[in-house]
Amino acid sequence: ARTFAELLDAPLAIIEKRRIGNSDRAELMNVIGEVKGRRAIIVDDEIDTAGTLMETVRALEREGVTEIYACATHGVLSDPAIERIRASSLREVVLTDSIPLPAEKRLPQITTLSVAPLIGEAIRRIHRGESVGALFSSEVSFTQEMLLWEDGIAKTLDMRGVPIETPARP
């Protein structure tokens, strides 16, 4: 979340929460930071049942946030996550395809980004004896370009897998 805030030149707010016992259930405590009248991006490692996500959405709405987006690396999306997301005010939920999303769980609100370019670049770096860790250093991981081979032609892709137009090399 801190890296996103820095890249977007936006303030960071934190939702304080604590786990209840040894369960997966979390209790939200406080919104730390000024969020009234702002757009919020909730950043988490995974969304399972979306219970904590929905509590976070409600807390942000109470604090006067105008639009809410969420992103997570892993979309487990166990029941009742899909119904919770569908019924929520979330504008968009961005996930990676680290866990396949079955057709019945696809919603217009959910955007899935491929991790294939990242994995491909990690494999290329391992093969060439280059640093894999550098892929995950704060700003580099969001702006890293990758050189991939397709049909014998080098293609440069951004981290979303979108081709980047590059000038011809002499």
Predicted regions and their residues:
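PRPP-associated nucleotide enzymes
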Residues: 1-170
